[in-house]
Structure formats: C-alpha cells, structure tokens
Regions:
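Extreme N-terminus of proteins, especially the signal/transit-peptide cleavage junction
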Residues: 1-5
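ABC family nucleotide-binding domain
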Residues: 6-222
Length: 228
C-alpha cells in the first residue's frame, strides 16, 4: 500500500494491577490502519477493545509496546515521547462516542465551534468552520437547534462534526451507532465513509452492532486481549 499507516501499533500490551490481582487487558497487539480506511474493533465485552482505543487515543498508558500516529512515533517501549498529550489529542485525533455528549445549553453550531475556540481559534472563524461542517454532514438546517430538539441521528451528526473540527486525520468511535435504528445507523456509517475517503482519514470503530458490519474495510477481532 502506497500510503504509510496513520495508526501503527506494535506489540501493545496493557495490564492492570500486579501479582495475584493482575489483569492482562491487552497482549502483544499489532495492527496498521491506513488513510481512507474505516475499520472495526470487534470482540466480546472485556476483550480489550475500548482499552486499545483509549491507548490509540493517547488517553490511557500502555504497559509496553510502541505506536506511531501519522508516521511519527509517539509511544516507545510503553513510554510516551510527547510531553503534552492533550495537545496531541486536540490537533490529531477526533472522538465520537455512543452518546453524543453535546452540551445541552449550546446550539448545534456552538457545540462544534467550542472545540475550535478551546484550541485558540477566534469565535467568528470557529462558528464559520462549524457551519461548514454541519452543512458537509447534511445537518446544516439544524445549526441553531438545541441538543434536546435534535433526533438521535441528527445529534450524532453534530457529534461527528465536532470530532472533525480540528481537521484530525485519525477518528476513534466507540459504539457510535448502538443507540440508533438501522436507517440512522446506515446514515452515520455512510457519513464516516465519506469522511474517510474525502478527508483521507483513518477511522477506527469499536462496535457490537451487527447491522453495520458490512460498512467496514477491515475487521480486527480481540479475544482475551489478543488479536484473533
């Protein structure tokens, strides 16, 4: 494949506790995800999917292993090489969750714009970018709506816009369609594929949702912390 992987994990392991209480959540997990790919992390509850997603998202420390994001090594032998992981997340990684977690007292536009303002962008420019993203995700007609007035599918599209605000090339989604019916889940997955192709992004989705399995380019299955 001509592109370098946007996400490369090499022998990632994670354990919690020590001695008799030690739990090995991940064991020597290696995988690559390339631009324009939408991939799934599958497996039963407790298999390590969310743990791996949180390590890729620079939220959780690994016990050992290495990781490169967009060609740059950020984790080596279980040690972070970047002093400011918050800035790394803010500018390189977008997060989408099962429940959209939109701020209830901000309208759709301001929910998206807030991410940009936290990164230092001027309010007017942040709102303009938010409107552009909402239009791109076909929910621009609801830009002034409060979260309580949005349908589940609309709210998740606003959450996707928020994840895209800082133009990340790596997008991590944890059960993004679990609360949606088949039609709305399909719309969300179509939009994620559009983002992957047009933005040359790598999208990793943790899911148990069988109705979206056909949307993925690749599927990685974890069992007992190992890739099956």
């Amino acid at each position: 494949m001509a592109d370098h992987p946007l996400v490369r994990c090499e022998r990632i392991s994670k354990h919690f506790g020590e001695g008799e209480t030690r739990v090995d959540a991940l064991r020597d997990v290696s995988l690559d995800v390339y631009p324009r790919q939408v991939v799934a992390l599958l497996g039963p509850s407790g298999s390590g999917k969310t743990t791996l997603l949180n390590i890729i998202g620079c939220i959780l420390d690994a016990s050992s292993g290495s990781m490169a994001l967009d060609g740059e090594t950020v984790l080596s032998e279980g040690r972070w090489l970047k002093p400011n992981l918050r800035q790394l997340r803010l500018h390189n990684i977008g997060f989408i969750f099962q429940f959209h977690n939109l701020i209830p007292f901000l309208d759709a536009t301001d929910n998206v714009a807030l991410v940009l303002q936290l990164a230092g962008e001027e309010a007017g420019a942040a709102r303009a970018r938010a409107v552009e993203l909402l239009d791109y995700l076909e929910v621009g007609h609801r830009r002034n709506a409060m979260p309580a007035k949005l349908s589940g599918g609309e709210a998740q599209r606003v959450a996707i816009a928020r994840a895209l605000a800082n133009r990340p090339r790596i997008i991590l989604a944890d059960e993004p369609t679990a609360a949606l019916d088949s039609k709305r889940a399909g719309i969300v997955m179509d939009l994620l594929r559009k983002v992957a192709v047009e933005q040359e992004a790598a999208i990793i989705v943790v899911t148990h949702d069988e109705k979206i399995f056909d949307w993925f380019d690749r599927k990685f299955t974890l069992r007992d912390g190992r890739l099956a």
